[in-house]
Amino acid sequence: MGRQRERSRPVRRDGEGMREAIRHIDSLERLKEWDAADLVNRANAIGNELSRRRMTTSQIRNFLDEVNRIHAETQGRGAEFDSSRVILLKPLLAYSAGHETNREKQEVLKSFANLFSAAADKVQDASNFKHFVDFTRAVVAYHRFYGGSNQ
């Protein structure tokens, strides 16, 4: 009976939550069209997945730190938003994935890079960037909630 119940549950393959989120992001014209409840639900699933796949807190925090730096610069001085700063996060993500020598960890970093590259492509202005920041912070929070660590 217990084995039967396990089989009836849908099995999610590694990376499936991120692939689903990428498909959803690709369907949006702008990131700000993303419903907040759906954004949080997807961030929850992705944070859990990243934790299970052993992405370290330092790897995810490095990206968040850069996102927060851009956010602070655009908020602090009333500076005009420059979307090229967000697009330039993509090479940072690629470097992080390419730098990893462990194949399993490299795969999760590539999935992470693909996810946030898709999101970065939808950031044209400050209001879209706010959704990008919210999504990034939510993924980081859920990663930590599900036990993401530095090991």
Task: Give the ranges of each region predicted by the language model.
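Intrinsically disordered, low-complexity arginine-rich tails of RNA-binding/processing proteins
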Residues: 1-23
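The feature represents the first ordered module of a protein
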Residues: 15, 19-109
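Amphipathic alpha-helical binding modules
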Residues: 110-148
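Charged, terminal alpha-helix-loop-beta segments
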Residues: 151
